[in-house]
Structures are given as C-alpha cells and as structure tokens.
Regions:
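Terminal low-complexity tails and localization/encapsulation signals of metabolic enzymes
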Residues: 1-4, 246-262
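A general structural signal for well-ordered alpha-helical segments in protein cores
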Residues: 69, 84, 144, 153-156, ...
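Glycine- (often His-adjacent) and acidic-residue-rich active-site loop
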Residues: 35, 49, 57-90, 106, ...
Length: 262
C-alpha cells in the first residue's frame, strides 16, 4: 500500500476511509494533496477488497477549507483550477461509491470536493458553501456545473451569486446532503449506510449504475436510453451476473425463490 504525505488511508471490511490530513491548514487543497488524491484513487480502483470509499477531514473543525491560498502565485493561479478539476472529477468518475463524510466546514473547494462524491453525510455542527464570489472569484473546481445538477438551477444561482453558506438542516432540506447527524455519530452513520446499503450490492451493478446516472444529464433522453442499453449489454459478464444473483439472495432471502427457479 502506498504512503502519503497529505492523506491517511485505512482499509477494513470493504471500506476504505480516506482522511485529508492537513488539520493545521484547515485541510485545504494544495497541489500535493490533489496529486495524492489521484494516486490513492488509482490504487483503490484496482483493490478488490475496497467496495466503498469514505472521504473525511482530520480534526473536528474542517472537512476541507478550499484551496490553499499560500500556493496562489501568478503561475499556479493559471493551472490550479484545471489541476483541481481533474482531481475532483476523478472522484466523480471513480467506479466505486464515494461518501463524503463532512465532519466540519466544507467551504469553496471543500464544497466542490463534497459534491463530486456520490453521497454526503454532514455533521449537524458543520457549514457548507461556495463563498468565492465574496472575494471576486468563482467556484472553478466544477461548482458552477455540479451544484445546479444537485440542487437545481435557481438554488445554485442563489448560493453562487450570494456566496452564503448553509447549515446542515438547510443543506438537507434542499437535497445537497444525504443525511445529517451529530458529529460524534457521523462516521458510524456513514459506515452503517455503506455496509448495509452498498457493500451487499453486486460490484458491476454499482459501478454501472454510477456511470449511467452520473452521465444521465449530459445527454438527451433518446441518447441516454441508447447509452444505457449499450452499457448494460457490454458490462455484465456471466460471472458478474452470478455475483448479482448471489448478492440479491444474501441481502433479501425473498429473492431466493426467483433466482433458484429452473
């Protein structure tokens, strides 16, 4: 298993817990961290033991505080948005489910990182938002594109144009996060969801579903239906179909009567 400077990777029982380990810098995004995001996701993609990834921040105050402004030189300012977008898009394109465990503030690039994940479990004490416009900037890590897809066009405009942040209750109400709970229970809640609702599902079915749903809004309905048909026909091998049947019967004994029929 590779070593990392900015991340802590722990693997157990199908879960890979990935912790941004820059608490003295509010777990902000620098080039080294984004490079290691790509490296760890490449490693976990081929790790058969990893079924679900949980991403969180070290400490209790910050999930991720956005871009590390100490690296904001004229030269890095030209390349950082594209470099950051590539790293965040890696989470979106990663073929296994990723849960953002938002244990603290997720501001700017931290919010953009969270919305690049598949699910967001948020501490009741945390805040989330894209305040870049308050500083004459924009959420250039994919926020202008992903946020409308999650909360709708009107709400995304409000949040991006005003730069205001949200508490957990409002984030839940608008569909920005999946669930909220006290910080002390947050990781356990996310792990329980992963173990009970994701790990029992067939690998190929989850990865294919993620691909199809993620790309659904990128095409018109007719193109999407054709893409769905082609993808499902080409990605399910006989072995994977057998795994799907086994997973279904384990998660719900009622399926045994269906799949056992000759």
């Amino acid at each position: 298993m590779p070593d990392f400077e900015t991340l802590i990777l722990e693997r157990k029982e199908g879960l890979a817990r990935l912790t941004i380990n820059r608490p003295k810098s509010a777990n902000t995004l620098n080039r080294k961290l984004m490079q290691e995001f790509n490296e760890v996701l490449d490693f976990l993609e081929t790790d058969r033991d990893t079924r679900v990834v949980l991403l969180t921040g070290a400490g209790e105050r910050h999930f991720c505080g956005g871009a590390d402004l100490r690296e904001a030189t004229p030269e890095t300012a030209k390349n950082m948005p594209a470099f950051g977008r590539d790293a965040l898009t890696h989470f979106e394109d990663f073929p296994k489910p990723v849960i953002a465990v938002v244990n603290g503030a997720a501001m700017g690039g931290g919010c953009e990182l969270a919305i690049a994940c598949d699910f967001r479990f948020m501490a009741e004490e945390a805040k989330i938002g894209v305040p870049e416009i308050l500083f004459g900037a924009l959420p250039a890590g994919g926020g202008t594109q992903r946020l409308p897809r999650i909360v709708g066009l009107a709400k995304a405009k409000e949040l991006i144009f005003t730069g205001r942040h949200l508490g957990a209750q409002e984030a839940l109400a608008i569909g920005l996060v999946t669930a909220i709970c006290p910080q002390k229970d947050l990781m356990a809640r996310a792990e329980t969801f992963a173990r009970e609702q994701l790990i029992p599902r067939a690998r190929y079915a989850l990865s294919t579903a993620k691909l199809l749903v993620t790309r659904a809004l990128d095409m018109d309905l007719a193109s999407g239906l054709a893409f769905e048909r082609r993808t499902i026909m080409t990605m399910a091998s006989p072995a994977e179909m057998a795994e799907a049947r086994e997973a279904a019967m384990k998660s719900n004994p009622a399926y045994q009567n269906i799949f056992s029929k000759k």
